[in-house]
UniProtKB/Swiss-Prot annotation:
Glycan-linked positions: N254, N258
Function: Symporter that cotransports neutral amino acids and sodium ions from the extracellular to the intracellular side of the cell membrane. The transport is pH-sensitive, Li(+)-intolerant, electrogenic, driven by the Na(+) electrochemical gradient and cotransports of neutral amino acids and sodium ions with a stoichiometry of 1:1.
Substrates-to-products reaction catalysed: L-alanine(in) + Na(+)(in) = L-alanine(out) + Na(+)(out); glycine(in) + Na(+)(in) = glycine(out) + Na(+)(out); L-serine(in) + Na(+)(in) = L-serine(out) + Na(+)(out); L-proline(in) + Na(+)(in) = L-proline(out) + Na(+)(out)
Chief localisation class: membrane
Ranges annotated as spanning the membrane: 80-99, 106-126, 162-180, 190-210, 219-239, 286-306, 323-343, 365-385, 407-427, 430-450, 466-488
Highest classification ranks of the organism: Eukaryota, Metazoa, Chordata, Craniata, Vertebrata
Family as reported in the entry's similarity comment: Belongs to the amino acid/polyamine transporter 2 family.
Ligand binding (Na(+)): N85, T379
Matching InterPro entries: AA_transpt_TM (IPR013057)
Name by which UniProt lists this protein: Sodium-coupled neutral amino acid symporter 2
GO molecular function: acidic amino acid transmembrane transporter activity; alanine:sodium symporter activity; amino acid transmembrane transporter activity; amino acid:sodium symporter activity; L-glutamine transmembrane transporter activity; neutral L-amino acid transmembrane transporter activity; neutral L-amino acid:sodium symporter activity; proline:sodium symporter activity
Gene: slc38a2
Low complexity biased stretches: 19-28
Disulfide bonds: C246-C274
Chain segments annotated as coiled-coil in the UniProt record: none
C-alpha cells in the first residue's frame, strides 16, 4: 500500500492554480504519529483517518512556503479505496436505528443531504489548502485563527478519535459475550459473559500491549480487512432479511431452516409493526443527524491523501471523493434499509447485536462477529496513537521519547475510554454526542471557517463566500440544535428512570 508523508513543513502551493503538485522536503520529528483509522487501520504514513492528529511545530510566521516538486504515487483507484476505508467506520452499525426513528423517506433525505454537505466540505477544504499553502489540517487552523484555530482543529480531531475508540470498545462489550456463549453453548450469566469485564480483559491483554508499541506500521493492513468485514456484514444483513420472519415470534431462537413460511398471526398490531414507515418523529429522531455525520467523517484524511495522489489536482481529488462517497452512500443505504426492514421498530442502536434476539447460535453471524471483533480490537491502538501524540504536544513535552510518559498517557487514555464504555448506557449516546459535536465541527464548521478566512481572492459578497457562510451558520445550527435535543433526551430519560425506580 502506498504511503505518503503526513506532515509537511514547507509548501509552495500556488493560490490560483487548480493543482497542488508539491511536497515537503523536511518533516517534523514526532515519533508517535499514527494513521487514521475508522473501522480500519489504513496508514498514510503518519496520518489517521477518522481520527487524526496533525499537530505541527512548524515555523508558521513565514509568508512563503518552499518545497521541491515531488509527485504523489497513489493511483486514482487506490485513492478511492483508501478514502473508502477512511469513511467506513462503526457508524454503519447505527444507521438502521436512525432509519427506524426517522422513517425510510426521511432517512434517505437526510442521508443524501449529509453526503452532499460532506462533499461540499471536501471542496472547501481542498480549495483552502491550495490557497492557504498547507496540507496539514491543524496548520490551516493556525494560519486562519492562530493558536485557537489550531486547538479547535486538534480538539475536534481528538474528540472524534476518542469517540471512534469508544464505539469500537462498545462493539466488544456488545458482541464478545454473544460469541463466548455460542462457543460454550451456554446462556448463563457468568462473569465471563459480562460485557464490562470482557472490555477490561481485552483492553489489558491485547489493546494495552499493542498501544505501548512505538510503531504500529504492520496494523495498517487491518484497513482492507475491516472494509471487507463491513462488505461481508452488509451481504449477511441483506441475506438475513429474507430468512427472518416478521413479526418475530416469541422464543424465536436457533432458527436455521424452514423460515420461508413465517408463522401466521391475526394480530393487527404485529402487522402494523411489520409495515415500513416513511416518516417518523419521536424522541429518538434527534440522534439521526449526529449518527449520519459520525458515519461520514473522514475530513482530516483528505489532505494527506491529496498530497499522496499521483498527478494531483483539486478536480482529481474531488472526483476521488465523489466516487468514494457514492460507494459508501450505497453501502450505508443498503445496510440501513435491510436492517430496518428485518427488525422494524425492534432494531437496536447497534444493528449486529439485534440479531441476538433471533439467533442464539448462527454460524454466519458468528463469523461476522469474530471478524468485526478482530478488526475493531486491532483498530483501537491505531486510533489511540494520534490522541496520545496530541496530549504529548499539549502538555509541552520534549521531543525526546520517554517511556514513563508514553506509558502513563497510554494507560490514562485507556482508563478514560473504558470508564466511558462501562458507564455510558448505550452506543447511541456515543454516536449522538460525538456526531453532534466533533463530527459537526470537522464537516461543517472548520472547513467553512478556514475557507472564509484564508481564501482572500474572493470577496465576502461572492457566491462562493456566501455559500461558505451559510454552510458555517448551518453547521452551528446542527451542532447546537442536536446537542440541545440530545441533552434534553438524556435529562428526560434520567427523570423517567428515577420516577420508575421511585414507583417501586
Amino acid at each position: 500500500m502506498n504511503k505518503a508523508p503526513a506532515q509537511m513543513s514547507r509548501f509552495n502551493i500556488a493560490p490560483d492554480m487548480d493543482s497542488s503538485s508539491t511536497n515537503s522536503n523536511e518533516y517534523t520529528n514526532y515519533q508517535d504519529h499514527a494513521s487514521k483509522v475508522p473501522l480500519n487501520g489504513i496508514q498514510y504514513s503518519d496520518v489517521e483517518a477518522e481520527s487524526q492528529n496533525f499537530l505541527s511545530d512548524h515555523h508558521l510566521g513565514k509568508k512563503k512556503y518552499e518545497a521541491e516538486y515531488s509527485p504523489g504515487s497513489a493511483s486514482f483507484g487506490m485513492s478511492v479505496f483508501n478514502l473508502g476505508n477512511a469513511i467506513m467506520g462503526s457508524g454503519i452499525l447505527g444507521l438502521s436505528y436512525a432509519m427506524a426513528n426517522t422513517g425510510i423517506a426521511m432517512f434517505v433525505i437526510l442521508l443524501v443531504a449529509v453526503a452532499i454537505f460532506s462533499l461540499y466540505s471536501v471542496h472547501l477544504l481542498l480549495k483552502t489548502a491550495n490557497e492557504g499553502g498547507s496540507l496539514v489540517y491543524e496548520q490551516l487552523g493556525y494560519k486562519a485563527f492562530g493558536i485557537p484555530g489550531k486547538l479547535a482543529a486538534s480538539c475536534s480531531i481528538t474528540m472524534q478519535n476518542f469517540g471512534a475508540m469508544a464505539s469500537y470498545l462498545y462493539i466488544v462489550k456488545y458482541e464478545l459475550p454473544i460469541v463466548i456463549r455460542a462457543f460454550l453453548d451456554s446462556n448463563d450469566n457468568a462473569w465471563y459473559t459480562n460485557g464490562d469485564y470482557l472490555v477490561l480483559i481485552v483492553t489489558m491483554s491485547i489493546i494495552l500491549p499493542l498501544s505501548l508499541l512505538k510503531n504500529l506500521g504492520y496494523l495498517g493492513y487491518t484497513s482492507g480487512f475491516s472494509l471487507l468485514c463491513m462488505v461481508f456484514f452488509l451481504i449477511v444483513v441483506i441475506y438475513k432479511k429474507f430468512q427472518i420472519p416478521c413479526p418475530l415470534p416469541e422464543n424465536f431462537i436457533n432458527i436455521t431452516v424452514n423460515v420461508s413460511q413465517p408463522p401466521q398471526t391475526n394480530n393487527s398490531t404485529d402487522e402494523e409493526c411489520c409495515k415500513p414507515k416513511y416518516f417518523i418523529f419521536n424522541s429518538q429522531t434527534v440522534y439521526a443527524v449526529p449518527i449520519l455525520t459520525f458515519a461520514f467523517v473522514c475530513h482530516p484524511a483528505i489532505l494527506p491523501m491529496y498530497e499522496e495522489l499521483k498527478d494531483r489536482s483539486r478536480r482529481k481529488m474531488q472526483n476521488v471523493a465523489n466516487v468514494s462517497f457514492l460507494g459508501m452512500f450505497i453501502m450505508y443505504l443498503l445496510a440501513a434499509l435491510f436492517g430496518y426492514l428485518t427488525f422494524n421498530e425492534a432494531v437496536e442502536p447497534e444493528l449486529l447485536h439485534t440479531y441476538s434476539k433471533v439467533y442464539n447460535f448462527d454460524v454466519v453471524l458468528l463469523i461476522v462477529r469474530l471478524a468485526v471483533l478482530t478488526a475493531v480490537t486491532l483498530t483501537v491502538p491505531v486510533v489511540l496513537f494520534p490522541i496520545r501524540t496530541s496530549v504529548n504536544h499539549l502538555l509541552g513535552a520534549s521531543k525526546e521519547f520517554s517511556w514513563p510518559r508514553h506509558i502513563c498517557i497510554t494507560v490514562a487514555l485507556l482508563v478514560c475510554v473504558n470508564i466511558l464504555v462501562i458507564f455510558v448506557p448505550t452506543i447511541r449516546d456515543i454516536f449522538g454526542f460525538i456526531g453532534a459535536s466533533a463530527a459537526a465541527m470537522l464537516i461543517f464548521i472548520l472547513p467553512s471557517a478556514f475557507y472564509i478566512k484564508l481564501v482572500k481572492k474572493e470577496s465576502m459578497k461572492s457566491v462562493q463566500k456566501i455559500g461558505a457562510t451559510l454552510f458555517l451558520i448551518m453547521g452551528f445550527l446542527v451542532m447546537t440544535g442536536s446537542m440541545a435535543l440530545i441533552i434534553m433526551d438524556w435529562i428526560h430519560n434520567a427523570l423517567s428512570s428515577e420516577e420508575h425506580t421511585g414507583g417501586h
